[in-house]
Amino acid sequence: MGIDASIRNQFPILDQQVNDRKLVYLDSAASSQKPLVVINAIDDYYKTIHSNVHRGVHTLGTRATDAYEGARENVRRFIQAQHHEEIIFTRGTTTAINIVASSYGMEHVEEGDEIVVTYLEHHANLIPWQQVAKRKKAKLKYVDLTADGRVTVEAVEAQLSDRTKIVAMAHVSNVLGTINPIKEVARLAHARGAVMIVDAAQSAPHQRINVTDL
């Protein structure tokens, strides 16, 4: 059995035919399929562990809390964060960005300030900042792309000013797969006193992430 077949066999949803052909799924950028190890872990949780976390001292409550905090520690190690307190669980990237925009954005962006985004952004990393800019009477600035769909450090720098408060950028484009130079952009943003917000939904599953280094 080749490595491709071995990996495919870990995804039971692919063991079916569509239009008389073996199913090939190419929409993982929107919603990824789950391997057996994940399906089995979720199944085991609901069969043997499920309870409220951080709410009770009974056996199931303790098991659920341990599993919950264990998952937080696994994520911390996976993205190489320094402290487990840095890891906050949400329903997904869209919800997470909306929370940041409606809390940090609404608190720290003032009239006349600037928010910088790129033309590569998923709507989840665009619409929340449009809303913040509109409500706070701030300016939303867009970074142009090269002819082949890339974001350059120079193009980002051209949009920064002393009024820049937030730079929001995808690490990897969900449409083109373009890898953006977020480390260099973060350095420029911080030099201006701005906060860098990275949408890493497409990069974290496919490349090594070190949020401390970024």
Model-based region annotation:
Residues 1-214:
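Pyridoxal 5′-phosphate
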